């Protein structure tokens, strides 16, 4: 249904049952597949609450590669518990000839989370600098622009404003399994409509959607997720090309990396301003605290637990 219509189709998965994707990758090898991988061995397993998750994901990814998958990769959520693994994870992905994408902790109704914070913001931000430098050293254009995305991650981690304004509800939307269409998956108040009751055009051209797009312009969340940030980087006239600001940043700093010169991060990021969080209890890992029983929700159930304020700063 979607393959002939979507320019890019991505399946994001925990990677624990890669065999379920084999038939898709065989038939549609250009389908983008990303497995969540938060670190090596026990680091990944503890963060994600998985038994032998690291080994299963890597083996599954290699199997999809054998079957002819052309756009395969891992994705990591940068945080205190895995930051020292991130550069090595990137190099590991390079060795396996698969992609590597990053994001950082976010709070959102979709995730049922409002206590995700980076505890040592400065330490984590400085480690991301190393990842940016490594990406700029490669010969892959995609990695150069991922380096810019990671510059935006540093701003997010430090609590600064976004590098580029958000375009939620205009350039992208979030559709949940029950056909509700949201401008994004962070704010539950940005519900645009429902595809069971309305057509796509009715939803996107409605007065409610225009009102929500105005709310997005005033949003102070400062999220920086890969998919949404990448969309905001695109040139509105020629979507296949980047906007001028990220383009020239990449040109200048790729040249510096090629010549062996350091990237002047202090020129782009104000490290003198770091948001100080209220005292937040450190998160427990699922494998350290309890066993979580997963189950499927029905359409009639309440799907999201709105627990307090969702804030990303």
Question: Where do the model's predicted regions map?
Answer:
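Radical SAM enzyme [4Fe-4S]-AdoMet core and its adjacent flexible, acidic
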Residues: 2-7, 27-38, 42-172, 176-182, ...
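Short beta->alpha connector loops
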Residues: 12-18, 78-82
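Residues that form or immediately flank small-molecule/cofactor binding pockets and catalytic motifs
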Residues: 16, 38, 105-107, 197, ...
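Generic structural signal for small/hydrophobic residues in well-ordered secondary structure
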Residues: 21, 35, 93, 100, ...
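Flexible mid-to-C-terminal extensions adjoining Fe-S/redox cofactors in radical SAM and related proteins
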Residues: 185-313
């Amino acid at each position: 249904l979607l393959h002939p219509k979507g320019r890019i189709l991505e399946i994001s998965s925990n990677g624990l049952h890669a065999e379920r994707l084999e038939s898709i990758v065989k038939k549609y090898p250009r389908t983008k597949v990303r497995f969540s991988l938060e670190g090596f061995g026990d680091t990944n397993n503890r963060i994600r609450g998985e038994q032998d998750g690291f080994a299963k994901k890597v083996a599954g990814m290699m199997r999809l590669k054998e079957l002819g998958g052309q756009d395969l990769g891992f994705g990591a959520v940068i945080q205190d518990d895995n930051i020292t693994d991130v550069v090595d994870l990137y190099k590991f992905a390079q060795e396996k000839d698969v992609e590597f994408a990053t994001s950082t902790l976010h709070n959102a109704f979709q995730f049922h989370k409002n206590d995700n914070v980076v505890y040592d913001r400065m330490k984590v931000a400085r480690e991301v600098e190393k990842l940016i430098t490594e990406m700029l050293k490669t010969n892959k254009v995609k990695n150069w622009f991922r380096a810019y995305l990671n510059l935006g991650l540093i701003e997010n981690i430090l609590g600064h404003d976004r590098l580029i304004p958000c375009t939620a509800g205009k350039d992208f939307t979030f559709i949940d399994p029950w056909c509700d269409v949201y401008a994004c998956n962070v704010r539950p108040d940005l519900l645009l409509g429902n595809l069971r009751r309305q057509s796509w055009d009715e939803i996107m051209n409605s007065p409610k959607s225009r009102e929500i797009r105005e709310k997005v312009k005033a949003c102070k969340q400062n999220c920086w997720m890969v998919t949404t940030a990448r969309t905001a980087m695109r040139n509105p006239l020629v979507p296949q090309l980047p906007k001028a600001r990220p383009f020239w940043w990449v040109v200048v700093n790729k040249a510096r990396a090629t010549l062996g010169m350091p990237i002047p991060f202090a020129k782009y990021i104000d490290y003198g301003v770091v948001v100080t969080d209220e005292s937040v209890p450190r998160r427990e890992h699922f494998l350290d605290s309890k066993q979580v029983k997963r189950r499927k929700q029905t359409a009639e159930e309440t799907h999201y637990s709105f627990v307090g304020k969702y804030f990303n700063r």
